[in-house]
Swiss-Prot record:
Residues 128-137 have a biased composition (Basic residues). GO terms for biological process: cytoplasmic translation; maturation of SSU-rRNA from tricistronic rRNA transcript (SSU-rRNA, 5.8S rRNA, LSU-rRNA); ribosomal small subunit assembly; translation. Pfam families: Ribosomal_S11 (PF00411). Component of the ribosome, a large ribonucleoprotein complex responsible for the synthesis of proteins in the cell. The small ribosomal subunit (SSU) binds messenger RNAs (mRNAs) and translates the encoded message by selecting cognate aminoacyl-transfer RNA (tRNA) molecules. The large subunit (LSU) contains the ribosomal catalytic site termed the peptidyl transferase center (PTC), which catalyzes the formation of peptide bonds, thereby polymerizing the amino acids delivered by tRNAs into a polypeptide chain. It is found in: Cytoplasm; Nucleus, Nucleolus. Present with 29600 molecules/cell in log phase SD medium. This is Small ribosomal subunit protein uS11A. InterPro entries: Ribosomal_uS11, Ribosomal_uS11_CS, Ribosomal_uS11_sf.
Length: 137
């Protein structure tokens, strides 16, 4: 199968951009619509040297720009965005890189279709880490 997607004239070729923004790193992962084939996957940690900067908005922006360039190479012109935080028993708010990655994808010329939050939310979860009296500083 060839990696270049053919588009009919005047139509968008969609992919799915999955942005996982934790407080330690940001992943920008683009797949085809079915989710089976990975087109590009770049993390904030691949773009910066210091460990503390992996989750920064700047690292997320660089990662998203790399992914967008690869998408255009392959022929994808638009993406549906699924943004995700750590979730579960941990935080349900995306890290600092989530917003920056989304903005960088839009500014790099990719059309944005739907934006969806797919953070896993427990219906009735296991016990949260930290014990009965919580984390004591």
């Amino acid at each position: 199968m060839s990696n270049v997607v053919q588009a009919r004239d005047n139509s968008q070729v969609f992919g799915v951009a999955r942005i996982y923004a934790s407080f330690n790193d940001t992943f920008v992962h683009v797949t085809d619509l079915s989710g089976k084939e990975t087109i590009a996957r770049v993390t904030g940690g691949m773009k910066v040297k210091a460990d503390r900067d992996e989750s920064s908005p700047y690292a997320a922006m660089l990662a998203a720009q790399d992914v967008a360039a690869k998408c255009k190479e392959v022929g994808i012109t638009a993406v549906h965005v699924k943004i995700r935080a750590t979730g579960g028993t941990r935080t349900k708010t995306p890290g600092p890189g989530g917003q920056a990655a989304l903005r960088a994808l839009a500014r790099s010329g990719l059309r944005i279709g739907r934006i969806e939050d797919v953070t896993p939310v427990p219906s009735d979860s296991t016990r949260k880490k930290g014990g009965r009296r919580g984390r004591r500083l």
